[in-house]
Regions:
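Sec-dependent N-terminal signal peptides
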Residues: 3-13
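N-terminal soluble domains immediately following signal/targeting peptides that reside
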Residues: 16-168
Length: 168
């Protein structure tokens, strides 16, 4: 039988949930020739991942949130959700964030502006390593909406890069 005090100590020292899932949608806006990115992630998982790379707590979604939070978040996602249009790495810019009504999740909004400079996007390659440094059972689900086509992709530690052919 497990000692209840020992169990409590380990639960407090190593809090986690059994599995982690992020949801990302990429929507191609043909009028603006941009890719709009919406991510839904756990605030707890985001804080944990950011603390690995950043020494200070950002206190995301609280009144004590650090002013640098959006820069740190953008940097993290530019490094852990790498999007290549026609095999060229794209950088995305911060649009905003909002806390979900459940107070557990956060929606993050980014954009890749002017991503169709050569006239046609023929392929998208995604490298998604979001929270893989912290979550043993991490899955990252991505929905890509490109013109009339939809693609559902799942990324894990064993499969973190996928390519979609878009050109006809």
């Amino acid at each position: 039988m497990i000692n209840p005090i020992l169990y409590l100590v380990f639960s407090l020292l190593f809090p986690s949930h059994d599995f982690q899932i992020t949801h990302t949608s990429l929507h191609y806006n043909s009028d603006l020739e941009s890719i709009e990115i919406t991510m839904k992630v756990s605030i707890e998982d985001l804080e944990r991942s950011l603390e690995i790379n950043n020494s200070e707590k950002l206190k995301i979604g609280t009144i004590k949130e650090k002013k640098s939070a959006h820069k740190v978040i953008t940097n993290y996602f530019n490094n852990h959700l790498r999007i290549f249009t026609n095999d060229k790495l794209s950088q995305f810019r911060w649009v905003g964030k909002e806390i979900d009504d459940n107070l557990h999740d956060i929606y993050l909004y980014f954009e890749i502006p002017n991503c169709n400079q050569n006239g046609e996007i023929k392929s998208l390659t995604l490298e998604n390593t979001i929270f893989l440094e912290t979550g043993l059972n991490q899955s990252n689900i991505v929905l890509v909406e490109f013109k009339d086509s939809n693609f559902n992709l799942t990324f894990t530690k064993d499969q973190d890069i996928q390519k979609i052919q878009l050109g006809k």
